[in-house]
Amino acid sequence: MLTLKVFVYTVVTFFISLFLFGFLSNDPGRNPGRKEEG
C-alpha cells in the first residue's frame, strides 16, 4: 500500500507542477505590454 501512496503522490505532484509551469509560462504571453523572453 505504501508504494501505491507514493505513486499517487508522485502523479499528483507531477500534474500540479505541470499545471503551474504551464500557467506561469502562458501568463506573460497573454500580456502584450510585457515581454520577457520573446
Swiss-Prot record:
Is the keyword Repeat assigned to this protein? Answer: no
Q: Where located?
A: Plastid, Chloroplast thylakoid membrane
Q: Which GO terms describe its biological process?
A: photosynthesis
Q: Which GO terms describe its cellular component?
A: chloroplast thylakoid membrane; photosystem II reaction center
Q: Which family does it belong to?
A: Belongs to the PsbI family.
Tell me, in a sentence or two, what this protein's role is.
Answer: One of the components of the core complex of photosystem II (PSII), required for its stability and/or assembly. PSII is a light-driven water:plastoquinone oxidoreductase that uses light energy to abstract electrons from H(2)O, generating O(2) and a proton gradient subsequently used for ATP formation. It consists of a core antenna complex that captures photons, and an electron transfer chain that converts photonic excitation into a charge separation.
Report what the protein is called.
Photosystem II reaction center protein I
Provide the species name: Welwitschia mirabilis
Q: Which gene carries the instructions for this protein?
A: psbI
